[in-house]
């Protein structure tokens, strides 16, 4: 926890206390989760949220999702290979080094949704795809096809996906074997980074 707090203070200076409130690190378990959340927000999540929020403000139809379905294990023929950070496969001695360097992924990794959305599972012989994987892929393709055709992903046989900005609370779809809508609880984190990056770009 002390090292985590020190890194946060180095990165954020006078705003570190607010960061530590939004991403607390009182225990090792909390540090692991908060450091993961903070790194993800800095790398990808905040910018994706900002992009979606600006389109929403402009009146565009925006439908946000969180992809939560992890890939299945690799087929036995892959013989100890490991998945790359954002796609691809690492084999043999390089794979052993990768396993040591990286902890096991929790949930779905970045880029894992692509082959599901494109319906390409059968062409990827690395993983032992299951009926549940096919189910998730069909769900995503249904939403994508509807959005391309009509600007609205909803359609017969699909769980209702609320448009961003509908209702009193911000909502998004969680894509998994059992898709469901979740209320956004992290907006304060994104709004903090919005202010932080605007201050960085403002003239002194």
What positions do the PLM features span?
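Substrate-gating cap/lid region and adjacent catalytic-acid/histidine neighborhood
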Residues: 1-132, 143, 150
């Amino acid at each position: 926890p002390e090292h985590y707090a020190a890194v946060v203070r180095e990165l954020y200076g006078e705003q570190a206390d607010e960061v530590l409130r939004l991403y607390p690190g009182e225990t090792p378990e909390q540090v692991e989760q908060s450091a993961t959340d903070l790194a993800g927000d800095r790398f990808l999540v905040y910018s994706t949220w900002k992009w979606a929020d600006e389109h929403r403000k402009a009146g565009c139809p925006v439908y946000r999702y969180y992809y939560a379905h992890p890939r299945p294990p690799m087929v036995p023929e892959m013989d100890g290979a490991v998945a790359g950070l954002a796609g691809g496969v690492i084999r043999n001695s390089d794979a052993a080094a990768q396993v040591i360097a990286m902890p096991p992924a929790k949930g779905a990794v970045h880029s894992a949704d692509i082959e599901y959305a494109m319906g390409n599972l059968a062409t990827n012989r690395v993983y032992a795809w299951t009926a549940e994987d096919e189910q998730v892929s069909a769900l995503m393709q249904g939403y994508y096809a509807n959005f391309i055709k009509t600007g609205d992903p909803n359609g017969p046989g699909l769980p209702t996906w609320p448009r961003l900005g509908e209702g009193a609370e911000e909502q998004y779809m969680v894509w998994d074997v059992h898709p469901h809508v979740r209320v956004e609880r992290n907006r304060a984190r994104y709004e903090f980074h919005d202010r932080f990056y605007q201050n960085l770009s403002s003239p002194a």
